[in-house]
UniProtKB/Swiss-Prot annotation:
Notes on the domains: The 9aaTAD motif is a transactivation domain present in a large number of yeast and animal transcription factors.
Annotated Polar residues bias: 325-340, 407-420
Protein localization: Nucleus
Protein name, entry field: Nuclear factor 1 B-type
Known partners and oligomeric status: Binds DNA as a homodimer.
Native source species: Homo sapiens (Human)
Disease the record associates with this protein: Macrocephaly, acquired, with impaired intellectual development: An autosomal dominant disorder characterized by postnatal macrocephaly and borderline to mild intellectual disability. Additional variable neurodevelopmental features include muscular hypotonia, motor and speech delay, attention deficit disorder, autism spectrum disorder, and behavioral abnormalities. Some patients present corpus callosum dysgenesis.
The family this protein is said to belong to: Belongs to the CTF/NF-I family.
Pfam family, one: NfI_DNAbd_pre-N
Ranges where the record places region Disordered: 189-208, 252-364, 377-420
GO biological process per UniProt: anterior commissure morphogenesis; brain development; cell differentiation involved in salivary gland development; cell proliferation in forebrain; chondrocyte differentiation; club cell differentiation; commissural neuron axon guidance; DNA replication
GO function terms (MF aspect): DNA binding; DNA-binding transcription activator activity, RNA polymerase II-specific; DNA-binding transcription factor activity, RNA polymerase II-specific; RNA polymerase II cis-regulatory region sequence-specific DNA binding; sequence-specific double-stranded DNA binding; transcription regulator inhibitor activity
Length: 420
């Protein structure tokens, strides 16, 4: 399978995205961006776009590079994955790709227990309901953000309030919609010069032409074409069914079909990392990030297995204990352990009196150890399991054998002590 380099970033490379990307309709990119352009224009100029300006924007979006459209779709799919409950993500992939009978796919509710809303563009000022986004993405139906009331759930849906299964979502059609469909059909047949249109009795009344004004810039044939075209068409990405990523949960187990992925790299090469940065990094109490405990085995585990380790739908979690503490080495993390406090051997002279009489400093809010930077106590090993004493250094010998004594009355020792 050939991938465009622009899409192989660590954020968008995920089996969930790989499997669903070929099923995203091409109209989704144009539609969401066109609505955003119109809102931005209205806020800036306090007037709506003219038809010529809107048509120019539409043509610009339609002619955008396929790699740009694919990258946008990958980011949006990554958002949708986080909003779908962990136990339903596998079912969502199987049902959208047609490898399983449609079943309910529940999303994470908002604070009020209702269906969530997301922004489909970066720094967008508009949010869309998840079920609306699903219909636009996978069915190619150009719905407005205010069309949520027109959506109806299938009678087979067990949780209509939170289900985002595209096959369970339908658009209610009113009488006006039926009338407009008939009117458009008659208009198209009149332009094509069909024999039935020559009958004056079947011609639509003349007043109908003055009753409707098309506000959009898409025509019927153009809408149908972009709603049926996959967003991956025209890119360097070929998504035949037999080359969908070979995750065991991407196909029906009873079918016996083994879906394989053909990459340009040799079979022995390591598969690129398939988890996003936010899943492999955990925040420290100070906001820093460090690899999660499961990251060393991330290359050999599937994304579904990694999802099972997460108890909440969010991908970021706080560690139970602070990274740096004055606890014993056994209590500290084996990956990011700091040297604990030891009793340092006395250094003759002034240095010993300073260390012995000085009170320990208050705890620092920064994630750095506050111990004095001096050699640890003589022992066979440091607290770190991989650091040992040099072979020539006897642990039982004190440091006074290796550090010259300090004599304030001697000018040589005083000079050498301060000059280091």
């Amino acid at each position: 399978m050939m991938y465009s380099p622009i899409c192989l970033t660590q954020d968008e490379f995920h089996p969930f995205i790989e499997a669903l990307l070929p099923h995203v309709r091409a109209i989704a990119y144009t539609w969401f961006n066109l609505q955003a352009r119109k809102r931005k224009y209205f806020k800036k100029h306090e007037k709506r776009m003219s038809k010529d300006e809107e048509r120019a924007v539409k043509d610009e979006l339609l002619s955008e590079k396929p790699e740009i459209k694919q990258k946008w779709a990958s980011r949006l799919l990554a958002k949708l994955r986080k909003d779908i409950r962990q136990e339903y993500r596998e079912d969502f992939v199987l049902t959208v790709t047609g490898k399983k009978h449609p079943c309910c796919v529940l999303s994470n509710p908002d604070q009020k227990g209702k269906i969530r809303r997301i922004d489909c563009l970066r720094q967008a000022d508009k949010v869309w309901r998840l079920d609306l986004v699903m219909v636009i993405l996978f069915k190619g139906i150009p719905l407005e953000s205010t069309d949520g009331e027109r959506l109806m759930k299938s009678p087979h849906c067990t949780n209509p309030a939170l289900c985002v299964q595209p096959h369970h979502i339908t658009v209610s059609v009113k009488e006006l919609d039926l009338f407009l469909a008939y009117y458009v059909q008659e208009q198209d047949s009149g332009q094509s010069g069909s024999p039935s249109h020559n009958d004056p009795a079947k011609n639509p009344p003349g007043y109908l032409e003055d009753s409707f004004v098309k506000s959009g810039v898409f025509n019927v044939s153009e809408l149908v074409r972009v709603s049926r075209t996959p967003i991956t068409q025209g890119t360097g990405v070929n998504f035949p069914i037999g080359e969908i990523p070979s995750q065991p949960y991407y196909h029906d187990m009873n079918s016996g079909v083994n879906l394989q992925r053909s990459l340009s790299s040799p079979p022995s090469s390591k598969r690129p990392k398939t988890i996003s940065i936010d899943e492999n990094m955990e925040p420290s109490p100070t906001g820093d990030f460090y690899p999660s405990p499961s990251s060393p085995a991330a290359g050999s585990r599937t994304w579904h297995e990694r999802d099972q380790d997460m108890s909440s739908p969010t991908t970021m979690k706080k560690p139970e204990k602070p990274l740096f503490s004055s606890a014993s080495p056994q209590d500290s993390s084996p990956r990011l352990s700091t040297f604990p406090q030891h009793h340092h051997p006395g250094i003759p002279g002034v240095a010993h009196s300073v260390i012995s009489t000085r009170t320990p400093p208050p705890p620092s809010p920064l994630p750095f150890p506050t111990q004095a930077i001096l050699p640890p106590a003589p022992s066979s090993y440091f607290s770190h399991p991989t650091i040992r004493y040099p072979p020539h250094l006897n642990p039982q010998d004190t440091l006074k054998n290796y550090v010259p004594s300090y004599d304030p009355s001697s000018p040589q020792t005083s000079q050498s002590w301060y000059l280091g």
